[in-house]
Amino acid sequence: MGIIRKIISVIIFALLASALWTASAKDVTVSGSSTVMPLAEAAAEEFNLLQKDYMVSVSAGGTGAGILGIAERKNDIAMASREITDEELQRFGNSFQQYLVCLDGISIAVSDEIYQAGVTELDKQQVHDIYSGNITNWKEVGGPDADIYVISREEGSGTRDEFNEIIMGNRSAETPGVDTVAMGAAEVKTAISGSDKAIGYLGFNYLGGAVMGIAFNGIKPNYENIKLDLYELHRHLYFYTYGKPSEGSQAFIDFVQGPEGQKIASEEGFIPI
């Protein structure tokens, strides 16, 4: 019985210690871009294991929602796949603090069947015409005789904003050729891999499996081309705070920008800064 009591005492002590640590740790909430989320989640997991002063939690919702969240003091850090817009500055003021966390590229991706049928490259005008609804069949761009299933991102997505700016001419451009709107990069990947005739756009780190990244204006979306700014759809990914960050927020930002965080960025398929 004495041994059993000791075992029970050890278990209870461990549970209480864990509860006390959780209660005493200061929360740091991170929200926003689904593109940046794999880096933030993996970094938060490691950061939470390495220290006991702060507990970082991460959730998606899109760049726009993340920026709104910090401006309204609902979250501490916003993940963003674009820079703050003039509209956001006018609405919330110029108190945003920007932190570069990694590099990425918006990849134009197609279903494996389309890639294998010969569509391994599109130029800017072709992508524009597909999303405008002017090109509706893959045979018009050297592919098979099949309707093009066009996937876009939801309103508020930083990736959508950047894509529209570069391809369509402005962030709020209409895209009448779109068949479905995906809520996040992972959903884009699922939609493309589940179709034999799809096209979509998503972060470089989401390519793989049946989701094939194609060359854009003759340049492939790979590590070297993005790092050297040769790929036109390259971009910077950010954390933002609204005003001076809290000690916990600053500690997490420093971790992500430091050697350990940048190693995680590379492991998650991003290009380190």
How would you name each of these model-derived features?
Residues 1-7:
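Positively charged n-region of N-terminal signal peptides that target proteins for export
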Residues 21-92, 96-273:
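Exported/periplasmic ABC-transporter solute-binding proteins
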Residues 8-19:
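Bacterial N-terminal signal peptides
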